[in-house]
């Protein structure tokens, strides 16, 4: 895959439930602490190395941001780092929180 794909929150949720992909959240630490998808890994410049070390490059990665815009650049970056399949989640955390309010965690 040379380009990331966009995915809606319902499809992202299904992939996560079926363990077909991992979810990363690239929002700032304060926003992440105020609420994030339960299974999201907080991906920052500081945690990128650990994420890459702990996740196989053939494991699909779904990238979440605020509204689905910033995640596109991060998704492309992860492809350039060698990940085979990367998705940008349309609507970002705001759409996730609206559609799956029971699956939002709080704190870092």
From Swiss-Prot:
InterPro entries: GlpE_sulfurtransferase, Rhodanese-like_dom, Rhodanese-like_dom_sf, Thiosulf_sulfurTrfase. It catalyses: thiosulfate + hydrogen cyanide = thiocyanate + sulfite + 2 H(+); thiosulfate + [thioredoxin]-dithiol = [thioredoxin]-disulfide + hydrogen sulfide + sulfite + 2 H(+). One of its GO terms (molecular function) is thiosulfate-cyanide sulfurtransferase activity. Residues 17-105 form the Rhodanese domain. Its main location: cytoplasm. GO terms for cellular component: cytoplasm. GO terms for biological process: glycerol metabolic process. The active site is at 65 (cysteine persulfide intermediate). Its EC number is 2.8.1.1. Keywords: Cytoplasm, Transferase. It is found in: Cytoplasm. Transferase that catalyzes the transfer of sulfur from thiosulfate to thiophilic acceptors such as cyanide or dithiols. May function in a CysM-independent thiosulfate assimilation pathway by catalyzing the conversion of thiosulfate to sulfite, which can then be used for L-cysteine biosynthesis. HAMAP family: Thiosulf_sulfurtr. Belongs to the GlpE family. This is Thiosulfate sulfurtransferase GlpE. It comes from Shigella boydii serotype 18 (strain CDC 3083-94 / BS512). The lineage of its organism: Bacteria, Pseudomonadati, Pseudomonadota, Gammaproteobacteria, Enterobacterales. The gene is glpE.
